[in-house]
Amino acid sequence: MQYLCQRCHSLINFKDVYDDDLLKLKNLPKSRFVQASSLTEMNESGESDDQMNSSSEDYPAQRLQLYKKTISEGDYNFDNVPPPELRTPTLDSFVVLPAAKDGYEEEKNSPEEVNDLFSWKIEIYNRIFDLLSSKTKVDHPLCVECAELLTEEMSKTLRALKEEKKMYFNYDNFLSSQTVHEENTAALDSEIDELMKQINEKEEKIEEISDETDKLQKLLRELDEEKEKVYAEEQEFYNNLNQFQIKKLSLERQYDCANLEFEHNSRKLEKLQKMNVFSDIFYISHYSEPNGEGSIATINGLRLGRLPSQKVNWAEINAAWGMTVLLLDVLTEKLDFHSSSYQLKPFGSQSFIIRFDRDPNGNQVKPTKLDLFSSGELKIFMNRRFDQGMVAFLDYLHQFGDFCAAKTPSAVLPYAIENDRIGGKCIRLAFNQDENWTRALKFVLTDIKFLEAYVSSQDKQSNF
Protein backbone atom coordinates (compact mmCIF):
# COMPACT_ATOMS: atom_id res chain seq x y z
CA MET A 1 0.00 0.00 0.00
CA GLN A 2 1.44 3.35 -1.08
CA TYR A 3 0.40 7.03 -0.77
CA LEU A 4 1.72 10.34 -2.07
CA CYS A 5 3.22 12.91 0.27
CA GLN A 6 0.90 15.96 0.26
CA ARG A 7 3.88 18.32 0.44
CA CYS A 8 6.59 17.02 -1.89
CA HIS A 9 4.35 14.50 -3.79
CA SER A 10 6.80 11.64 -3.34
CA LEU A 11 5.74 8.02 -2.73
CA ILE A 12 5.23 6.86 0.86
CA ASN A 13 5.78 3.17 1.69
CA PHE A 14 3.98 1.70 4.72
CA LYS A 15 5.26 -1.43 6.39
CA ASP A 16 2.73 -4.22 6.02
CA VAL A 17 1.28 -5.77 9.16
CA TYR A 18 0.48 -9.49 9.25
CA ASP A 19 -3.04 -10.14 8.20
CA ASP A 20 -3.70 -12.30 11.29
CA ASP A 21 -2.72 -9.47 13.56
CA LEU A 22 -4.86 -7.07 11.54
CA LEU A 23 -7.80 -9.41 11.88
CA LYS A 24 -7.30 -9.38 15.62
CA LEU A 25 -7.04 -5.60 15.63
CA LYS A 26 -10.03 -5.36 13.34
CA ASN A 27 -12.27 -6.78 16.04
CA LEU A 28 -10.86 -4.41 18.65
CA PRO A 29 -12.69 -1.22 17.51
CA LYS A 30 -15.97 -3.10 17.44
CA SER A 31 -15.60 -4.16 21.07
CA ARG A 32 -14.67 -0.62 21.98
CA PHE A 33 -17.67 0.76 20.15
CA VAL A 34 -19.87 -1.64 22.09
CA GLN A 35 -18.29 -0.68 25.39
CA ALA A 36 -18.61 2.98 24.52
CA SER A 37 -22.27 2.60 23.70
CA SER A 38 -22.82 0.66 26.91
CA LEU A 39 -21.04 3.36 28.89
CA THR A 40 -23.27 5.96 27.32
CA GLU A 41 -26.37 4.00 28.23
CA MET A 42 -25.14 3.58 31.79
CA ASN A 43 -24.57 7.30 32.10
CA GLU A 44 -28.06 7.98 30.80
CA SER A 45 -29.60 5.45 33.21
CA GLY A 46 -27.70 6.96 36.15
CA GLU A 47 -25.48 4.02 37.03
CA SER A 48 -22.55 4.80 39.26
CA ASP A 49 -18.94 4.88 38.29
CA ASP A 50 -18.21 1.83 40.38
CA GLN A 51 -20.66 -0.21 38.36
CA MET A 52 -19.06 1.05 35.21
CA ASN A 53 -15.65 0.20 36.54
CA SER A 54 -16.82 -3.27 37.45
CA SER A 55 -18.14 -3.80 33.92
CA SER A 56 -14.94 -2.53 32.38
CA GLU A 57 -12.33 -4.60 34.07
CA ASP A 58 -10.37 -4.87 30.84
CA TYR A 59 -9.29 -1.17 30.99
CA PRO A 60 -7.22 0.69 33.63
CA ALA A 61 -9.11 3.20 35.76
CA GLN A 62 -7.09 6.24 34.57
CA ARG A 63 -7.63 5.43 30.91
CA LEU A 64 -11.27 4.74 31.55
CA GLN A 65 -11.73 8.15 33.18
CA LEU A 66 -10.03 9.85 30.21
CA TYR A 67 -12.16 7.87 27.83
CA LYS A 68 -15.37 8.82 29.64
CA LYS A 69 -14.36 12.47 29.70
CA THR A 70 -13.63 12.42 26.00
CA ILE A 71 -16.93 10.73 25.22
CA SER A 72 -18.93 13.16 27.35
CA GLU A 73 -17.23 16.27 25.92
CA GLY A 74 -17.16 15.08 22.31
CA ASP A 75 -19.83 14.68 19.71
CA TYR A 76 -19.10 11.06 18.95
CA ASN A 77 -21.91 8.73 17.97
CA PHE A 78 -21.11 5.06 17.62
CA ASP A 79 -24.66 3.81 17.09
CA ASN A 80 -24.64 3.97 13.32
CA VAL A 81 -21.08 3.13 12.41
CA PRO A 82 -21.02 2.05 8.75
CA PRO A 83 -19.12 -0.97 7.62
CA PRO A 84 -15.51 -0.34 6.76
CA GLU A 85 -15.25 1.30 3.33
CA LEU A 86 -13.28 4.06 1.57
CA ARG A 87 -15.53 7.04 2.33
CA THR A 88 -13.05 9.91 1.96
CA PRO A 89 -10.29 8.90 -0.40
CA THR A 90 -7.13 10.95 -0.07
CA LEU A 91 -6.39 13.11 -3.08
CA ASP A 92 -3.49 12.08 -5.27
CA SER A 93 -3.31 8.68 -3.46
CA PHE A 94 -3.55 5.19 -4.77
CA VAL A 95 -3.34 1.61 -3.41
CA VAL A 96 -0.81 -0.94 -4.53
CA LEU A 97 -1.48 -4.51 -3.53
CA PRO A 98 1.73 -6.05 -2.17
CA ALA A 99 3.08 -9.29 -3.54
CA ALA A 100 2.67 -12.40 -1.45
CA LYS A 101 5.45 -12.81 1.07
CA ASP A 102 7.49 -15.90 1.31
CA GLY A 103 6.11 -18.24 3.91
CA TYR A 104 2.71 -16.59 4.01
CA GLU A 105 -0.05 -19.12 4.19
CA GLU A 106 -2.95 -17.93 2.09
CA GLU A 107 -5.19 -20.71 3.23
CA LYS A 108 -5.50 -19.24 6.70
CA ASN A 109 -7.96 -16.53 5.54
CA SER A 110 -10.74 -16.63 3.06
CA PRO A 111 -10.82 -14.20 0.07
CA GLU A 112 -13.71 -12.27 1.64
CA GLU A 113 -11.68 -11.72 4.79
CA VAL A 114 -8.66 -10.59 2.77
CA ASN A 115 -10.71 -8.05 0.79
CA ASP A 116 -12.38 -6.89 3.97
CA LEU A 117 -8.96 -6.53 5.56
CA PHE A 118 -7.63 -4.26 2.78
CA SER A 119 -10.78 -2.15 2.79
CA TRP A 120 -10.50 -1.80 6.51
CA LYS A 121 -6.82 -0.81 6.26
CA ILE A 122 -7.65 1.86 3.67
CA GLU A 123 -10.48 3.16 5.85
CA ILE A 124 -8.21 3.36 8.91
CA TYR A 125 -5.48 5.22 7.03
CA ASN A 126 -7.93 7.63 5.47
CA ARG A 127 -9.54 8.39 8.84
CA ILE A 128 -6.16 9.00 10.41
CA PHE A 129 -5.07 11.29 7.59
CA ASP A 130 -8.39 13.19 7.62
CA LEU A 131 -8.14 13.66 11.38
CA LEU A 132 -4.56 14.90 11.15
CA SER A 133 -5.41 17.22 8.27
CA SER A 134 -8.37 18.72 10.17
CA LYS A 135 -6.34 19.27 13.37
CA THR A 136 -3.34 20.87 11.68
CA LYS A 137 -2.70 23.38 8.92
CA VAL A 138 -0.81 20.79 6.87
CA ASP A 139 -2.43 18.14 4.67
CA HIS A 140 -1.53 14.49 5.43
CA PRO A 141 0.00 12.01 4.75
CA LEU A 142 3.60 13.24 4.83
CA CYS A 143 6.84 11.48 4.06
CA VAL A 144 9.52 11.08 6.73
CA GLU A 145 11.57 14.03 5.51
CA CYS A 146 8.58 16.39 5.32
CA ALA A 147 7.36 15.17 8.72
CA GLU A 148 10.77 15.91 10.24
CA LEU A 149 10.79 19.38 8.67
CA LEU A 150 7.29 20.00 9.98
CA THR A 151 8.35 18.80 13.43
CA GLU A 152 11.30 21.18 13.43
CA GLU A 153 9.10 24.11 12.40
CA MET A 154 6.54 23.29 15.08
CA SER A 155 9.34 22.94 17.65
CA LYS A 156 10.63 26.40 16.74
CA THR A 157 7.11 27.79 17.03
CA LEU A 158 6.69 26.09 20.38
CA ARG A 159 9.95 27.53 21.68
CA ALA A 160 8.94 31.00 20.52
CA LEU A 161 5.58 30.68 22.26
CA LYS A 162 7.28 29.52 25.43
CA GLU A 163 9.59 32.53 25.33
CA GLU A 164 6.64 34.83 24.79
CA LYS A 165 4.79 33.16 27.65
CA LYS A 166 7.81 33.59 29.88
CA MET A 167 8.07 37.28 28.95
CA TYR A 168 4.39 37.89 29.73
CA PHE A 169 4.73 35.98 32.97
CA ASN A 170 7.74 38.06 34.07
CA TYR A 171 5.97 41.29 33.17
CA ASP A 172 2.90 40.19 35.13
CA ASN A 173 5.12 39.47 38.13
CA PHE A 174 6.71 42.89 37.74
CA LEU A 175 3.32 44.60 37.73
CA SER A 176 2.16 42.55 40.68
CA SER A 177 5.26 43.50 42.69
CA GLN A 178 4.62 47.23 42.28
CA THR A 179 2.85 48.82 45.29
CA VAL A 180 0.77 51.92 44.86
CA HIS A 181 0.82 54.47 47.69
CA GLU A 182 -1.79 57.12 48.35
CA GLU A 183 0.59 60.03 47.58
CA ASN A 184 1.48 58.43 44.33
CA THR A 185 -2.21 58.01 43.67
CA ALA A 186 -2.89 61.70 44.35
CA ALA A 187 0.01 62.71 42.13
CA LEU A 188 -1.19 60.38 39.44
CA ASP A 189 -4.73 61.78 39.76
CA SER A 190 -3.37 65.30 39.46
CA GLU A 191 -1.30 64.29 36.47
CA ILE A 192 -4.32 62.59 34.95
CA ASP A 193 -6.41 65.76 35.47
CA GLU A 194 -3.68 67.82 33.86
CA LEU A 195 -3.51 65.41 30.97
CA MET A 196 -7.30 65.49 30.60
CA LYS A 197 -7.17 69.29 30.61
CA GLN A 198 -4.51 69.20 27.94
CA ILE A 199 -6.58 66.70 26.01
CA ASN A 200 -9.61 69.02 26.18
CA GLU A 201 -7.48 71.95 25.06
CA LYS A 202 -6.08 69.86 22.22
CA GLU A 203 -9.60 68.79 21.25
CA GLU A 204 -10.71 72.44 21.18
CA LYS A 205 -7.67 73.30 19.13
CA ILE A 206 -8.43 70.36 16.86
CA GLU A 207 -11.97 71.69 16.41
CA GLU A 208 -10.58 75.14 15.57
CA ILE A 209 -8.14 73.57 13.15
CA SER A 210 -10.99 71.51 11.70
CA ASP A 211 -13.07 74.67 11.19
CA GLU A 212 -10.08 76.39 9.64
CA THR A 213 -9.52 73.33 7.48
CA ASP A 214 -13.14 73.46 6.31
CA LYS A 215 -12.71 77.12 5.43
CA LEU A 216 -9.49 76.37 3.62
CA GLN A 217 -11.15 73.47 1.80
CA LYS A 218 -13.97 75.78 0.74
CA LEU A 219 -11.45 78.40 -0.35
CA LEU A 220 -9.52 75.70 -2.18
CA ARG A 221 -12.67 74.61 -4.02
CA GLU A 222 -13.37 78.23 -4.96
CA LEU A 223 -9.79 78.59 -6.15
CA ASP A 224 -10.13 75.37 -8.14
CA GLU A 225 -13.27 76.72 -9.77
CA GLU A 226 -11.48 80.00 -10.47
CA LYS A 227 -8.55 78.01 -11.81
CA GLU A 228 -10.83 76.08 -14.16
CA LYS A 229 -12.40 79.34 -15.29
CA VAL A 230 -8.99 80.94 -15.85
CA TYR A 231 -7.82 77.81 -17.65
CA ALA A 232 -10.85 77.95 -19.95
CA GLU A 233 -10.22 81.65 -20.61
CA GLU A 234 -6.56 80.86 -21.24
CA GLN A 235 -7.50 78.14 -23.71
CA GLU A 236 -9.88 80.53 -25.47
CA PHE A 237 -7.17 83.21 -25.50
CA TYR A 238 -4.62 80.85 -27.02
CA ASN A 239 -7.16 79.65 -29.57
CA ASN A 240 -7.86 83.25 -30.55
CA LEU A 241 -4.12 83.93 -30.56
CA ASN A 242 -3.54 80.97 -32.87
CA GLN A 243 -6.28 82.17 -35.18
CA PHE A 244 -4.77 85.65 -35.11
CA GLN A 245 -1.31 84.27 -35.83
CA ILE A 246 -2.67 82.26 -38.75
CA LYS A 247 -4.47 85.33 -40.08
CA LYS A 248 -1.35 87.42 -39.51
CA LEU A 249 0.80 84.94 -41.44
CA SER A 250 -1.74 84.93 -44.25
CA LEU A 251 -1.77 88.73 -44.36
CA GLU A 252 2.03 88.82 -44.23
CA ARG A 253 2.17 86.45 -47.18
CA GLN A 254 -0.32 88.60 -49.04
CA TYR A 255 1.70 91.69 -48.10
CA ASP A 256 4.92 90.08 -49.34
CA CYS A 257 3.22 89.05 -52.56
CA ALA A 258 1.85 92.57 -52.98
CA ASN A 259 5.31 94.03 -52.31
CA LEU A 260 6.89 91.70 -54.84
CA GLU A 261 4.22 92.54 -57.35
CA PHE A 262 4.62 96.25 -56.58
CA GLU A 263 8.40 96.05 -57.02
CA HIS A 264 7.96 94.15 -60.26
CA ASN A 265 5.41 96.64 -61.53
CA SER A 266 7.58 99.54 -60.34
CA ARG A 267 10.55 98.23 -62.27
CA LYS A 268 8.32 97.61 -65.23
CA LEU A 269 6.86 101.11 -64.93
CA GLU A 270 10.32 102.62 -64.62
CA LYS A 271 11.36 100.70 -67.68
CA LEU A 272 8.27 101.87 -69.52
CA GLN A 273 8.83 105.43 -68.36
CA LYS A 274 12.35 105.34 -69.64
CA MET A 275 11.08 103.91 -72.88
CA ASN A 276 10.27 106.40 -75.64
CA VAL A 277 7.25 104.96 -77.37
CA PHE A 278 7.54 107.33 -80.29
CA SER A 279 11.17 106.48 -80.92
CA ASP A 280 10.35 102.77 -80.76
CA ILE A 281 7.45 103.09 -83.18
CA PHE A 282 9.03 105.70 -85.40
CA TYR A 283 12.72 104.96 -85.46
CA ILE A 284 14.58 107.88 -87.08
CA SER A 285 18.14 107.38 -88.21
CA HIS A 286 20.28 108.03 -91.28
CA TYR A 287 21.82 105.96 -94.02
CA SER A 288 25.41 106.83 -94.98
CA GLU A 289 26.80 106.17 -98.43
CA PRO A 290 29.72 103.75 -98.50
CA ASN A 291 31.86 106.19 -100.53
CA GLY A 292 31.24 108.99 -98.01
CA GLU A 293 29.45 111.26 -100.49
CA GLY A 294 26.56 111.96 -98.06
CA SER A 295 23.82 110.40 -95.98
CA ILE A 296 20.07 109.99 -96.27
CA ALA A 297 17.71 110.29 -93.30
CA THR A 298 15.52 107.23 -92.63
CA ILE A 299 12.35 106.64 -90.68
CA ASN A 300 11.59 103.03 -89.80
CA GLY A 301 14.22 102.04 -92.37
CA LEU A 302 12.57 104.01 -95.18
CA ARG A 303 14.90 106.48 -96.91
CA LEU A 304 13.61 110.03 -97.21
CA GLY A 305 15.61 111.60 -100.04
CA ARG A 306 17.94 110.56 -102.83
CA LEU A 307 21.53 111.09 -103.92
CA PRO A 308 23.15 111.07 -107.35
CA SER A 309 25.08 107.95 -106.46
CA GLN A 310 21.99 106.13 -105.26
CA LYS A 311 18.65 106.67 -106.85
CA VAL A 312 15.93 105.80 -104.27
CA ASN A 313 12.64 104.87 -105.87
CA TRP A 314 9.71 107.15 -105.22
CA ALA A 315 7.59 104.45 -103.64
CA GLU A 316 10.07 104.29 -100.72
CA ILE A 317 10.26 108.09 -100.53
CA ASN A 318 6.45 108.37 -100.50
CA ALA A 319 6.22 105.71 -97.76
CA ALA A 320 8.84 107.61 -95.73
CA TRP A 321 6.79 110.81 -96.15
CA GLY A 322 3.68 108.94 -94.96
CA MET A 323 5.48 107.80 -91.77
CA THR A 324 6.79 111.36 -91.21
CA VAL A 325 3.30 112.87 -91.55
CA LEU A 326 1.86 110.25 -89.21
CA LEU A 327 4.54 110.89 -86.57
CA LEU A 328 4.05 114.67 -86.64
CA ASP A 329 0.27 114.24 -86.47
CA VAL A 330 0.60 111.98 -83.39
CA LEU A 331 2.94 114.45 -81.66
CA THR A 332 0.63 117.42 -82.25
CA GLU A 333 -2.36 115.45 -81.06
CA LYS A 334 -0.45 114.41 -77.94
CA LEU A 335 0.18 118.04 -76.98
CA ASP A 336 -3.29 119.06 -78.19
CA PHE A 337 -1.89 121.39 -80.87
CA HIS A 338 -4.26 122.63 -83.56
CA SER A 339 -3.24 124.80 -86.49
CA SER A 340 -5.70 127.20 -88.05
CA SER A 341 -3.90 127.09 -91.40
CA TYR A 342 -3.11 123.42 -91.95
CA GLN A 343 -4.39 119.92 -91.26
CA LEU A 344 -2.33 116.78 -91.73
CA LYS A 345 -3.88 113.77 -93.43
CA PRO A 346 -1.66 110.71 -92.98
CA PHE A 347 -2.62 108.11 -95.59
CA GLY A 348 0.55 106.08 -95.97
CA SER A 349 2.20 106.60 -99.34
CA GLN A 350 -0.67 108.92 -100.38
CA SER A 351 -0.51 111.33 -97.43
CA PHE A 352 -1.31 114.99 -97.96
CA ILE A 353 -1.84 118.25 -96.11
CA ILE A 354 -4.82 120.60 -96.35
CA ARG A 355 -4.19 124.33 -96.41
CA PHE A 356 -6.89 126.78 -95.32
CA ASP A 357 -6.52 130.07 -97.28
CA ARG A 358 -8.27 133.33 -96.48
CA ASP A 359 -9.26 136.30 -98.67
CA PRO A 360 -8.18 139.86 -97.89
CA ASN A 361 -11.26 140.25 -95.75
CA GLY A 362 -10.21 137.37 -93.54
CA ASN A 363 -12.84 134.99 -94.74
CA GLN A 364 -11.85 131.37 -95.25
CA VAL A 365 -11.93 130.19 -98.82
CA LYS A 366 -12.05 126.69 -100.20
CA PRO A 367 -9.35 124.44 -98.63
CA THR A 368 -6.47 123.38 -100.84
CA LYS A 369 -5.19 119.82 -100.91
CA LEU A 370 -1.42 119.63 -101.21
CA ASP A 371 0.28 116.31 -101.92
CA LEU A 372 3.14 114.91 -99.89
CA PHE A 373 3.98 112.27 -102.44
CA SER A 374 5.26 112.23 -106.01
CA SER A 375 5.24 109.87 -108.94
CA GLY A 376 8.70 110.93 -110.08
CA GLU A 377 7.46 112.21 -113.46
CA LEU A 378 9.02 115.38 -114.77
CA LYS A 379 5.77 117.33 -114.84
CA ILE A 380 5.96 120.84 -113.60
CA PHE A 381 2.38 120.81 -112.28
CA MET A 382 2.89 117.63 -110.30
CA ASN A 383 6.20 118.86 -108.83
CA ARG A 384 4.56 122.19 -108.04
CA ARG A 385 1.86 120.58 -105.90
CA PHE A 386 4.48 118.37 -104.21
CA ASP A 387 6.72 121.37 -103.53
CA GLN A 388 3.79 123.36 -102.09
CA GLY A 389 2.88 120.40 -99.88
CA MET A 390 6.46 120.15 -98.52
CA VAL A 391 6.56 123.93 -97.91
CA ALA A 392 3.17 123.74 -96.11
CA PHE A 393 4.47 120.78 -94.02
CA LEU A 394 7.57 122.80 -93.15
CA ASP A 395 5.40 125.75 -92.09
CA TYR A 396 3.22 123.43 -89.97
CA LEU A 397 6.37 122.05 -88.33
CA HIS A 398 7.53 125.61 -87.66
CA GLN A 399 4.22 126.47 -85.95
CA PHE A 400 4.41 123.35 -83.77
CA GLY A 401 7.99 124.20 -82.81
CA ASP A 402 6.92 127.69 -81.76
CA PHE A 403 4.09 126.12 -79.72
CA CYS A 404 6.53 123.90 -77.84
CA ALA A 405 8.97 126.79 -77.31
CA ALA A 406 6.13 128.86 -75.85
CA LYS A 407 5.52 126.16 -73.25
CA THR A 408 9.18 125.44 -72.62
CA PRO A 409 11.61 128.20 -73.68
CA SER A 410 14.48 125.74 -73.87
CA ALA A 411 12.61 123.64 -76.44
CA VAL A 412 14.09 125.33 -79.53
CA LEU A 413 14.32 123.43 -82.78
CA PRO A 414 17.87 122.39 -83.72
CA TYR A 415 17.42 123.67 -87.28
CA ALA A 416 15.62 126.96 -87.75
CA ILE A 417 12.83 127.18 -90.28
CA GLU A 418 12.27 130.21 -92.47
CA ASN A 419 9.77 130.17 -95.33
CA ASP A 420 10.77 127.24 -97.57
CA ARG A 421 14.16 126.73 -95.98
CA ILE A 422 15.30 124.73 -92.97
CA GLY A 423 18.83 125.01 -91.70
CA GLY A 424 19.54 127.15 -94.76
CA LYS A 425 18.53 124.39 -97.20
CA CYS A 426 15.56 124.70 -99.54
CA ILE A 427 12.98 121.98 -99.31
CA ARG A 428 11.61 122.47 -102.82
CA LEU A 429 12.41 119.81 -105.38
CA ALA A 430 12.06 122.01 -108.48
CA PHE A 431 15.20 123.77 -109.58
CA ASN A 432 17.11 122.18 -106.70
CA GLN A 433 19.88 119.64 -106.42
CA ASP A 434 19.19 116.23 -104.94
CA GLU A 435 21.91 116.69 -102.33
CA ASN A 436 20.40 119.95 -100.99
CA TRP A 437 16.85 118.57 -101.03
CA THR A 438 17.93 115.39 -99.27
CA ARG A 439 19.80 117.40 -96.63
CA ALA A 440 16.72 119.60 -96.06
CA LEU A 441 14.63 116.44 -95.50
CA LYS A 442 17.30 115.19 -93.09
CA PHE A 443 16.98 118.44 -91.10
CA VAL A 444 13.19 117.99 -91.08
CA LEU A 445 13.49 114.52 -89.50
CA THR A 446 16.06 115.84 -87.03
CA ASP A 447 13.67 118.58 -85.84
CA ILE A 448 10.83 116.04 -85.63
CA LYS A 449 13.04 113.70 -83.58
CA PHE A 450 13.78 116.59 -81.22
CA LEU A 451 10.05 117.30 -80.86
CA GLU A 452 9.48 113.59 -80.34
CA ALA A 453 11.86 113.58 -77.34
CA TYR A 454 10.23 116.74 -75.98
CA VAL A 455 6.71 115.30 -76.20
CA SER A 456 7.89 112.10 -74.53
CA SER A 457 9.40 114.06 -71.62
CA GLN A 458 6.21 116.09 -71.24
CA ASP A 459 4.20 112.89 -71.18
CA LYS A 460 6.37 111.44 -68.39
CA GLN A 461 6.04 114.62 -66.33
CA SER A 462 2.27 114.56 -66.68
CA ASN A 463 2.20 110.95 -65.46
CA PHE A 464 4.10 111.87 -62.29
Curated annotation (Swiss-Prot):
The keyword Transport applies. Residues 144-274 form a coiled coil. One of its GO terms (cellular component) is phagophore assembly site. GO terms for molecular function: phosphatidylinositol 3-kinase binding; protein-macromolecule adaptor activity. It is found in: Endosome membrane; Vacuole membrane; Preautophagosomal structure membrane; Cytoplasm. Disulfide bonds: none annotated. Residues 38-57 are annotated as: Disordered. Residues 275-461 are annotated as: BARA. GO terms for biological process: autophagosome assembly; cellular response to nitrogen starvation; late endosome to vacuole transport; macroautophagy; mitophagy; phosphatidylinositol biosynthetic process; protein transport. Disruption phenotype: Impairs atg8-processing. Decreases sporulation in conditions of nitrogen starvation. Keywords: Autophagy, Coiled coil, Cytoplasm, Endosome, Membrane, Phosphoprotein, Protein transport, Transport, Vacuole. Its main location: membrane. It is a peripheral membrane protein. The C-terminal domain called the BARA domain is dispensable for the construction of both vps34 PI3-kinase complexes, but is specifically required for autophagy through the targeting of complex I to the preautophagosomal structure. Functions as a part of the autophagy-specific VPS34 PI3-kinase complex I that plays a role in autophagosome assembly. This complex is essential to recruit the atg8-phosphatidylinositol conjugate and the atg12-atg5 conjugate to the pre-autophagosomal structure. Also functions as part of the VPS34 PI3-kinase complex II. Component of the autophagy-specific vps34 PI3-kinase complex I composed of vps15, atg6, pik3/vps34, atg14 and atg38. Also a component of the vps34 PI3-kinase complex II composed of atg6, pik3, vps15 and vps38. Belongs to the beclin family. This is Vacuolar protein sorting-associated protein atg6. The gene is atg6.
